[in-house]
């Protein structure tokens, strides 16, 4: 027999939650490491900061990708997510159109500046690791194929697999699988094309940390 005599009901206030709880931990880590300040110090793309700084745009794009965003338009979902905004302590974030305008301000030099800002912040994490953390550092290079949805985007080409897109060069620290540098190339580029100067640059990252 089902009497239901052990059922209790409680009324609670309406709550808010995130689908991706880890974004808060990532944001907090970036704050403690001073990532935003390092980006703003090095990267100068905006003449005025009303109201956003370079770091606001960079982190906005990064968080969109981390939350499974596939395109700039997906940022609009975050703009209307009060729980997400509260989690970041933000009243608002850049809209998709503003974010698109920001990406078009980049050239090769500014992209390199951004990667170096991230690497400089990354070294703070390495310095806090055990003494033998980077007693040996292994640099890994590889090329991959990044397909696109169109055939008319600037710089793309047909890969040897018959896929239209790009063939980015990825330079990583094999010890931790961290991407140190990412270099975009046409889809028909061979894996090793242009890798030597980037390997040389990667060997300079974290030299003060290697023991």
Over which residues does each language-model region extend?
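Dynamic "connector" segments at or just before major functional cores
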Residues: 1-209
């Amino acid at each position: 027999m089902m009497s239901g005599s052990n059922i209790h009901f409680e009324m609670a206030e309406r709550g808010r939650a995130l689908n991706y709880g880890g974004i808060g931990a990532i944001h907090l880590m970036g704050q403690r490491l001073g990532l935003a300040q390092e980006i703003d110090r090095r990267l100068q793309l905006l003449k005025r900061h009303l109201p956003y700084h370079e770091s606001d745009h960079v982190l906005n794009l990064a968080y969109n990708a981390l939350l499974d965003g596939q395109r700039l338009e997906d940022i609009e979902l975050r703009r209307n997510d009060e729980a997400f905004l509260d989690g970041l302590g933000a009243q608002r974030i850049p809209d998709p159109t503003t974010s698109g305008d920001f990406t078009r301000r980049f050239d090769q030099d500014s992209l390199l500046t951004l990667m170096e800002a991230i690497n400089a912040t990354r070294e703070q994490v390495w310095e806090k690791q055990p003494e033998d953390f980077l007693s040996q550092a292994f640099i890994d290079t590889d090329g991959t194929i990044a397909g696109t949805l169109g055939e008319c985007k600037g710089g793309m080409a047909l890969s040897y697999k018959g896929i239209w897109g790009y063939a980015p060069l990825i330079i990583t620290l094999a010890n931790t699988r961290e991407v140190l540098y990412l270099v975009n190339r046409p889809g028909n580029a061979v894996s090793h094309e242009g890798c030597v100067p980037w390997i040389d640059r990667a060997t300079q990252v974290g030299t003060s940390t290697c023991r």
